[in-house]
Amino acid sequence: MLDVNKFEYMKIGLASPEKIRSWSYGEVKKPETINYRTLKPEKDGLFCERIFGPTKDWECHCGKYKRVRYKGVVCDRCGVEVTRSKVRRERMGHIELAAPVSHIWYFKGIPSRMGLVLDMSPRALEEVIYFASYVVTDPGDTPLEKKQLLSEKEYRAYREKYGQSFQASMGAEAIKKLLQDIDLDKEVAALKEELKTAQGQRRARIIKRLEVLEAFRSSGNDPAWMVLDVLPVIPPELRPMVQLDGGRFATSDLNDLYRRVINRNNRLKRLLDLGAPNIIVQNEKRMLQEAVDALIDNGRRGRPVTGPGNRPLKSLSHMLKGKQGRFRQNLLGKRVDYSGRSVIVVGPNLKMYQCGLPKEMALELFKPFVMKELVERGLAHNIKSAKRKIERVHPEVWDVLEDVIKEHPVLLNRAPTLHRLGIQAFEPTLVEGRAIRLHPLVCTAYNADFDGDQMAVHVPLSAEAQAEARLLMLAAQNILNPKDGKPVVTPSQDMVLGNYYLTMEREGAIGEGMVFKDTDEALLAYHNGYVHLHSRIAIHAGSLKNETFTEEQNNKLLLTTVGKLIFNEILPNSFPYINEPTTENIEGRTPDKYFLDKGVNVREEIRKRELVPPFKKKVLGQIIAEVFKRFKITETSKMLDRMKDLGFQYSTKAGITIGVADIVVLPEKQEILDEAQAKVDTVLKQFRRGLITDEERYERVISIWSAAKDKIQDRLMKSLDKRNPIFMMSDSGARGNASNFTQLAGMRGLMANPAGRIIELPIKSSFREGLTVLEYFISTHGARKGLADTALKTADSGYLTRRLVDVAQDVIVREEDCGTDRGILARALTDGTEVVVKLEERLVGRYAHKTVRHPETGEVIVRKDEMITEDIANEIMKAGITEVWIRSVFACNTRHGVCKKCYGRNMATGMDVEVGEAVGIIAAQSIGEPGTQLTMRTFHTGGVAGDDITQGLPRVQELFEARNPKGQAVISEIDGTVISINKTRDNQYEVVVQGEVETRTYVAPYNARLKVEEGQRVERGQELTEGSVDPKQLLRVRDITSVQEYLLREVQKVYRMQGVEISDKHIEVMVRQMLRKVRVIDAGDTDVLPGTLLDVHQFTDVNAKALREGKRPATARQVLLGITKASLETDSFLSAASFQETTRVLTDAAIKGKRDELLGLKENVIIGKLVPAGTGMARYRKVKPAVKKETASDTVSSK
C-alpha cells in the first residue's frame, strides 16, 4: 500500500495508449455483467474475475482453490488469481476500440484544445468527428489544402478528378492523423514570428494557440493522445452492482454506459470483418464515438443518454462534479467512525471544560477502550468475552467506563460549523438520559439554543489527537473570538439578568446606610432579612483585602451594596473592586468618591448621591476581557463559571416575570399622534396646491411618522419604572430592545409593502391595545419577507464563506519574518466625516514598521518591528498622532503565506501568531460567519436619486468578487482642477477636469449626484459623483495601495453598519489573495506569453532570471481578481478542481502536465495527508509525543 506521507507532489497528464494498456489486467470483450442464475460474474464481461480479481477473499471463480494458503496462485481451470477481493477496487481493464475515438473534454471544452492545436474551428472539428464532412489529411500534388473540409459531393468530385493523388478521410482517425503530423517546435517558432506583427483578434488567437502548443511541448504529452485507441475500464467495485431485497439489481450508471460502448464496438468489429459498405461502417463509428462521449461526459454534446424514467445517466465527469461528486462528497468530507449525535440540553452545573455525555452513547463510543480495560483488569478473559459483557451491559462495565473517559476529551460539533469555534473539546462526564449536556456559556460560540438543536460527538483516538484536543481545542481555551479578539463566552439571557439584578441599587431599601465590619457580617444580615441586596451600605475597606486599595483607602469605609459585595467575590483578589460600570473602574482602580472617612454620617452621604447603574451585558464583557488580559486562561474560565452560577442563582431569586400588566401604555400617546396627523394634513394641502411633488410628499409623510414613533419611544423609555421587569430585561441586554418595547406599548409604526416600499399609513396601535384587521394584514407583509430573507441569506452567506475559504486556504504563517521593506500607513478608516474603524483598533496587535516618536517630546513610543499593545496604542492616541506606519499582510513578501511580523497578533489567543497557523481559513471564517447577520435588502433611498445603494451581504459579495458595482461612481483619471460643470439636454452632467498635460470630460449619468464643484482640485481616482467605485478601474487609474485601502474600508463599512466588528487583518488576507496575480503585457526576451496570468512571485523569478542572463525583462500589470476567479487561478489543480468547473480545470491541467506541490490544505485533505498547517507542518512533524498509549485502533485490530 502506498504511504501517503512519502510523496512530494502529484502530477496529471494525458495517458498514452501504451500507458492505458499497462494499467489494465485484461481486455473486457463482452457487455455481460453477472450471470442471472449463478449470480457470478461472466467471463470477459464487465465484472470478470479473471481481469479484476476474485469476488470472495482467497477464493477463485470455480472454487478449486480456497483459503489463504493458496495466496498468489492462478487457478488453472478458471484463470483467477487467489488474492484479497479488495483488488477489485484497484484493478483496471481496457477495451480495444475498433476505430479511434476523440475525447470529448479536449474537443468540446471551451476553448476547444483540439481546435487550437490544429487551428480549426470547433464547428469544422465536429463535422469531421461525427462523419458529416471529409477533411484533407494530405493534399499530395493537388491544389487542395491540408485541413480543408469537403462535403460528400465535393469529395466524390475530387476523387474522380484527381484519383488517389490526395488523401481525405473523416472521423477521429482523420483528426488523429492531423495531430500526428504536427511538428510542435516548428509550429511554435512560426507562431512566435507571426506574433510580432499580428494585431487585434488574430493576435489573441495566436496567443491562445501558443499557450496550448507550449503546454504540449513542455509537458511531453503527445497531441495525438487526445484521440483514444484504447478505453480504460474502471475497477468494478467503483461501479458496483448490488442485489436488492426483491431480487432486482441496482447498478451504477457507468455499467450501462460501458455496455453501450462494448456493444457498439463489437458490432463495428463484426461489420469491418464482414467488409460492410462504407456508409454502414461510418454510421457505426459515429455511434461508437457518441457512446464514448456519453461515458466520459454525458450531456456535453446533444441530448444526454437517459435511463429508465428519462433520467440522464451519470457519466465519469458527473462522478467528479458538484456537491455530490467524488471531490466534495468523499474526498473533502468523509463520514467517520467513533461518532454519535443527540439532542442537547443545558448543563448549568458543568464546569467550563466539561460536557455531559449520555451513558449508553459513551459506552458505544469508548467500547474498544472499555474492552481493553476489562481484559487488563482480569474482568474478562479475552476481547471476545469483554465484548459480550459490554453488549449485555454488566454492572462492572460502568465503573470501567468512568475510568476510561477520565482525562479523555471528546469533540462536540454543531452544524453549521461557521467558524473554528463550531468544534470544541470537552471532558465528558457521564449523565443519565439520552441527551448531551452543554455548558451554557459556550452556546454563543456554537450559536446553539436548547429548542431541539442536535450536536455531534467525536472521539479523538491517538495520543497526538488527544493532546491537541486538550491543549488547543478545549472550550476553556477558546475564550476569545478569532474575528475581533473580544471574549465570545460572555454570559447571556438569565445570567445577564441575574448579575444585573444583583448589582442594582435602590433608594430607601431595607437596611440602607448600615455599616458592616466585613463581607460575612453583611451577608449574615442579608440572609436574616435586615438588609436587601439593593441596599446601599458601607463596609470597612480593609476587610476586603483587595490588593488595588491604597493604604489610605484601606482605612476608610467603602460605599457599596450587598449585591456588589457578592459580585466582587467572584473576581481575583488583585482585581479592582468594581463599584460602578465604567472603564476607569474596570481597567484602573475603584474611584475615590466611594471611600468615606470613618465617622461620617453614612445615611446623609447616601441621600446626597445619585444611584449607580447596574452592570449590563456589555460591562460583563469588559470585565471578562480585562480579567483575561491580566490573568490569562485558567483564571478567566474559573471566573466565568462563578459568574454563570451567580447569574442563574440571582435571576431565580429575583423571580423576574412578565405579565400584561407590565406593559404600560403611554398616556400622552394620542396627543403625539394627533399632532403628527395635523402635520400630514398640511403636507397634503401643499401637495394639492401643487407646491410639492408626489415624491416629496411621500418623503415628508414618512419622516413625520418616523419622528412621531421616535418621540413615543423616547417618552416611553423616560416614563418607565427602572424596576419594570421588561425594562430590566432590555436594559441589561438579556433580551429585547427599546424598539420591541415601543411596539408592545407605544405604536408599531411604519411597515413596508411586499415590494419593500414603505406604506405611508402607519400602524398606530400597539400590541397591548391590539391591532385592527387592516393593521394586522399590513404587518404580515414584513413578517413574511423577514422569513423568506433569512432563508435566502443563510444559503448566500454559506456560499460566500465557501468561496472565501477556497481562495485563502493556502495562506499559512510560514516564517518568522519576511524581511520586507514596505508597510502601510494606518489612519482611522473614515466614510466622509464618520469614523468607521478607529485608529487604535487598527494598531493593536500589529508590529510597527517605523519607530513612532512623541510629536512634542520626541521620546520613542514604540520602536520599529515592535508589537503595539493596547497600552502603547493608547499612548499613541494621547500623543495626538493620526497616522502610523505598521507592518501589514498587504506588504508581506512570504510566498504561499504570510510571516509572523506582518500578521501580528493572533486574535484568538491574544498572543503572537504561531508559525503554522492557518490564518487564511481563520480570515475566511471571520468574514463569512457574521454574513448571516448582514441584511439582504438593497435599500430604496427614495428621493431624486432613486438609485439603489447595495448594502449588506450583496455588497460584500460585490466587493470580494470585484464586480462592477451597482450605482457606479464616475472617477477622475487625472490630477487636475474641475474647470466647468454643465448640464446637457438629457439631464446629464458634463464635468471637465483640466490637468497639466490633458483635459478630460466626464459624463455623469442621469440623476447622479455630484461630489465636486467648479474650481475644486481633484486627484486621480477621486470620485466625481456619489456611488461605489469600481475597484478594477481604480487599480488602472491609481495604484495598488489605494485599491487595498478602498476594499478594506468598504467591507468594514458594511460590517460596522450592522454592528459587527472584524479585525482588519482578516480582510487584508482576502484582498491580498485577490491581488496576487499580474498579467503580462510585453514578454521581453522571456519565455512567458503576453496576456498570461502569473503569480507575482513567479513573475519576479522570471524577470530575475532574464536580468541575470542579460535579456530584456517582461512587463506586467497588476490585476484584481474576484475570489471565485482567484480560486480557479490557483497553482494547485486539485484545489481548483474541487472548487468549481471541475472538468475545465482538469482538462487544462492534464494538457499542461501540471504538478500539484501540495502546499495548501485542501490538496492534502484530498490525498489523505496531514494538512501542512499547525502541528502538521514539516518542522513540527519530526516532534514525536513521548507518551506511548495504545490507541483505540490498536485495540480494535487485535480482536
Curated annotation (Swiss-Prot):
Keywords: DNA-directed RNA polymerase, Magnesium, Metal-binding, Nucleotidyltransferase, Transcription, Transferase, Zinc. It comes from the Bacteria. The keyword Phosphoprotein does not apply. One of its GO terms (cellular component) is DNA-directed RNA polymerase complex. It catalyses: RNA(n) + a ribonucleoside 5'-triphosphate = RNA(n+1) + diphosphate. SMART domains: RPOLA_N (SM00663). It holds the Pfam family RNA_pol_Rpb1_3. Mg(2+) binds at D449, D451, D453. Binds 1 Mg(2+) ion per subunit. Binds 2 Zn(2+) ions per subunit. One of its GO terms (molecular function) is DNA binding. Zn(2+) 2 binds at C818, C892, C899, C902. One of its GO terms (biological process) is DNA-templated transcription. The keyword Nucleus does not apply. Its EC number is 2.7.7.6. Its cofactor is Mg(2+); Zn(2+). InterPro entries: DNA-dir_RpoC_beta_prime (IPR045867), DNA-dir_RpoC_beta_prime_bact (IPR012754), RNA_pol_asu (IPR000722), RNA_pol_N (IPR006592), RNA_pol_Rpb1_1 (IPR007080), RNA_pol_Rpb1_3 (IPR007066), RNA_pol_Rpb1_3_sf (IPR042102), RNA_pol_Rpb1_4 (IPR007083). Zn(2+) 1 binds at C60, C62, C75, C78. Belongs to the RNA polymerase beta' chain family. DNA-dependent RNA polymerase catalyzes the transcription of DNA into RNA using the four ribonucleoside triphosphates as substrates. The RNAP catalytic core consists of 2 alpha, 1 beta, 1 beta' and 1 omega subunit. When a sigma factor is associated with the core the holoenzyme is formed, which can initiate transcription. This is DNA-directed RNA polymerase subunit beta'. It comes from Geobacillus kaustophilus (strain HTA426). The gene is rpoC.
